[in-house]
């Protein structure tokens, strides 16, 4: 049998064909850490006794979870990263003011490219599969070993193929597609497998693809990955500062399952507490009152997400019982929102706009929920206590549904506020 797209990339890295289930050691193209995971990795790296990192250009350190620093402990965490980067001459350390949410920032800076093998000490490292590379989350000890050796080990995953057909309806986006898929297969439906997306992928923008790949981990997947096409090429062009290689799956590649996803049939989706698989069509939600709306994150903080929110919020007001928080994912996105007038309209509507941070998504800072409060968020997880008090609730949706709901005061379709 032939090789899947993920297996093709891994095979090229070790110089022979791999098969599902075998353990392999692979050279990595990028090693990523943030202000939660990198300090642990740095301490482990120092225990190894290496004088230098394997390659100062292939490590990215991005403080994003608790920045700007929310307290003394978070400030100390970032300082560990800062000192380590300076000591080892690490090129890709992104200080406050230059930083962004890591999984939006690295593609934007051209640090992850088609055909790469990327590991990150963050579970949503799978985001970069939108660019036809193998990217996956690891623990801090694996990050430490990779910083020292430039290598990581994996069990080669089996794969599930998702064949996309049709086109997206108005107000339906990549977030709705991945919520629909997770609702269909469950949070363990792709456990340690590669989710490979093919078919009519041209119906999805690159931002849609980032969103879908980002949430592959919410189905338990090892990685998510899209075919390379002209949309991928257009995004990478002008960002890539080195050569990259494009891979294609074999026609006779073996998949554990194959799903056909008809995009025409997907309506806006909402994931109810406390799992991303608890999805319902917007038409089945009922009248769910909300206290807070969050638009942003590594899942939905890109420019197209901001544009959708702008189109819905322009000339309208946030409901008096709702707090709307908007987080552009990078400084570049933030600046473009300023230039286009999005920020002005957000503020006029009654939203609070923040510098890039992961803060509210993980219940870290800048948007914590109190007991009994209910949030609708464009983030990727809605576990118990994810955004604050254990007795709060988090619902997940697209930016379109989130913006519309901020106006209405309860979860609604964008069609209801047009």
Swiss-Prot record:
Q: EC number(s) in its UniProt entry?
A: 4.2.1.33
What's the top EC group for this one?
Answer: lyase
A GO biological process of this protein is: L-leucine biosynthetic process
| InterPro entries referenced in this protein's UniProt entry, alphabetically | Acnase/IPM_dHydase_lsu_aba_1/3 (IPR015931), Acoase/IPM_deHydtase_lsu_aba (IPR001030), Aconitase_4Fe-4S_BS (IPR018136), Aconitase_4Fe-4S_dom (IPR036008), HAcnase/IPMdehydase_lsu_prok (IPR011826), Homoacnase/IPMdehydase_lsu (IPR006251), IPM_dehydratase_rel_enz (IPR050067), IPMI_cat (IPR033941)
Return the cofactor note field: Binds 1 [4Fe-4S] cluster per subunit.
Q: Where does [4Fe-4S] cluster bind?
A: 298, 358, 361
- Biological pathway: Amino-acid biosynthesis; L-leucine biosynthesis; L-leucine from 3-methyl-2-oxobutanoate: step 2/4
Which is one GO molecular function term here?
4 iron, 4 sulfur cluster binding
Cofactor(s) needed for function: [4Fe-4S] cluster
- Superkingdom is Bacteria
Keywords recorded for this protein, A-Z:
4Fe-4S, Amino-acid biosynthesis, Branched-chain amino acid biosynthesis, Iron, Iron-sulfur, Leucine biosynthesis, Lyase, Metal-binding
Q: Which reaction does it catalyse?
A: (2R,3S)-3-isopropylmalate = (2S)-2-isopropylmalate
Give the UniProt family note: Belongs to the aconitase/IPM isomerase family. LeuC type 2 subfamily.
Q: What is the role of this chain?
A: Catalyzes the isomerization between 2-isopropylmalate and 3-isopropylmalate, via the formation of 2-isopropylmaleate.
Q: Quote the subunit structure annotation.
A: Heterodimer of LeuC and LeuD.
Show the PANTHER family listed in the entry.
3-ISOPROPYLMALATE DEHYDRATASE LARGE SUBUNIT 2, HOMOACONITASE, MITOCHONDRIAL-RELATED
Instruction: Note the NCBIfam families from the entry.
Output: hacA_fam (TIGR01343), IPMI_arch (TIGR02086), LEU2 (TIGR02083), PRK00402.1 (NF001614)
How is this protein named in the record? 3-isopropylmalate dehydratase large subunit
Species assigned in the record: Thermoanaerobacter sp. (strain X514)
